[in-house]
Design a protein with these regions (language model features):
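Extracellular beta-helix/beta-solenoid repeat scaffolds
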Residues: 104-106
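Catalytic Cys-His active-site segments of thiol-dependent hydrolases/isopeptidases
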Residues: 136-138
């Protein structure tokens, strides 16, 4: 299984500004305020240069789900000035998460860990390794592009000086 196979199978399209590819797989009924009751997407990031989830935040909680491939390293910058790194992946006994809730208003960005064909737990179609991560995100109320706020690395780095290098790596103009 390759990223190209997954792109074709799921009919993934580029995610505007943020990076990666996605397809919305579900949207609930409209709530009357322009937002659906909930949304779900399947998404793909790779280790290709420039392919990462750029820093952004959303007005509601977002649940990230690990599906296949290499672990995904998420940088989270909380409104109170704290920060943390969470790794989505299959090795839950080593502290990885198959599901993680990012609280509303938290800046988030993500990059695939591992790399290249044969990396991780296998490049044999088993879903491990190969320089990519297939994951999903779920929100309720649902995602809208109007609620997406793109992060500015130059503004965020002074607020989280211990994460300045990582912020620079996950910024995108």
């Amino acid at each position: 299984m390759t990223p190209e196979d997954l792109i074709a199978h799921y009919e993934l399209e580029p995610i505007p500004r943020e990076g990666g590819r996605f397809r919305q797989t579900w949207a609930g009924p409209d709530r009357g305020d322009g937002r659906p009751e909930g949304t779900a997407i399947v998404a793909l990031l790779t280790t290709e240069p420039g392919d990462y989830s750029a820093l952004h935040r959303l007005p509601g909680d977002e649940i990230w789900h690990y599906h296949l491939g290499d672990p995904l390293r998420m940088l989270l910058l909380a409104p109170d000035g704290s920060s943390r790194v969470v790794v989505l992946g299959p090795d839950v006994l080593a502290g990885q998460h198959v599901q993680y809730v990012v609280p509303a208003g938290t800046w988030m960005g993500a990059r695939v860990l591992g790399g290249g064909s044969g990396g991780g737990s296998g490049g044999d179609g088993s879903g491990g390794g190969g320089g990519w991560t297939l994951f999903g995100c779920t929100m309720a109320p649902g995602f809208t592009f109007e609620g997406y706020e793109h992060g500015d690395a130059a503004e965020l780095a002074p607020l989280y000086p211990d994460r300045a290098v990582e912020i620079g790596e996950l910024g995108r103009a």
